[in-house]
Regions:
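Signal that preferentially marks extracellular ectodomain short beta-strand elements
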Residues: 140-155
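Short, surface-exposed beta-strand/strand-loop-strand elements in extracellular ectodomains
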Residues: 88-114
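A short beta-strand element within beta-rich, extracytoplasmic domains
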Residues: 76-86
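Edge beta-strands of jelly-roll/beta-sandwich modules across compartments, strongly enriched
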Residues: 65-67, 89-98, 149-153, 166-181
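Non-catalytic extracellular/lumenal accessory regions of secreted precursors
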Residues: 26-68, 74, 118-120, 130-131, ...
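Sec-dependent N-terminal signal peptides of Gram-positive bacterial secreted proteins and lipoproteins
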Residues: 1-27
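Noncatalytic modules at the cell exterior or secretory-pathway interfaces
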Residues: 75-76, 154-170
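Surface-exposed loop/turn motifs at beta-strand-loop junctions within extracellular Ig-like
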Residues: 24, 83, 169-171
Length: 181
């Protein structure tokens, strides 16, 4: 019995020491920030930092919605869109399509931008659900107009310049992941 108590005490001391030593080396996990898109581009949420965002779209089926991004400094930015899905009742077998458009204010008004993306340059970023991609696109040559589950857009911006990101999704209310770097 004494051996068991000594063993338990030794184990407790070792575990306590490990906990105390490992705590300073832990990296905090940062969850994706959630933002809600708006059907009015002028009232859309304005993202001002790089990072990963979960964007919620509460507009009805076949309606556009917007978010904005204002560049914190001059440079090339990569926007990665992925994991498009319905907000409620999502099943992995659903097949939906959508589009992403990027607009910038110019001296002539708001203008759609041609951006570098998977497979070339395009004004329209065609996106789809994972099931659609697996059934119809996977294994084919990727073109700028291909329906992809994950798609990037590269754009050069000046400090303080704002882009408007418009999405359209056939599944109605939806969400997606947006990574800005």
């Amino acid at each position: 019995m004494k051996k068991v108590k000594k063993l338990l005490c030794a184990l407790l001391i070792v575990l306590t020491a490990m906990t105390m030593l490992s705590e300073p080396f832990q990296v905090p996990v940062q969850a994706a920030r959630t933002v809600t898109a708006n059907k009015n581009p002028n009232k859309a949420v304005n993202i001002k930092k790089k990072g990963t965002y979960r964007v919620l779209s509460k507009t009805k089926m076949n309606k556009d919605d917007y978010i904005r991004f204002t560049a914190p400094k001059k440079g090339k930015y990569t926007l990665t869109f992925s994991d498009f899905r319905k907000l409620k009742g999502y099943t992995p077998s659903e097949r939906h399509l959508g589009s992403v458009y990027i607009y910038k204010n110019t001296k002539y008004g708001r203008s759609m931008q041609r951006v570098k993306t998977n497979g070339g340059k395009s004004y329209t970023l065609s996106i789809c659900s994972k099931a659609w991609y697996n059934d119809y696109t996977k294994g084919k040559k990727i073109k700028a107009v291909s329906d992809l589950h994950t798609r990037y857009a590269k754009i050069s911006l000046k400090k303080g310049e704002t882009i408007y990101i418009k999405t359209f999704w056939t599944g109605g209310k939806h969400s997606y992941s947006l990574k800005i770097k």
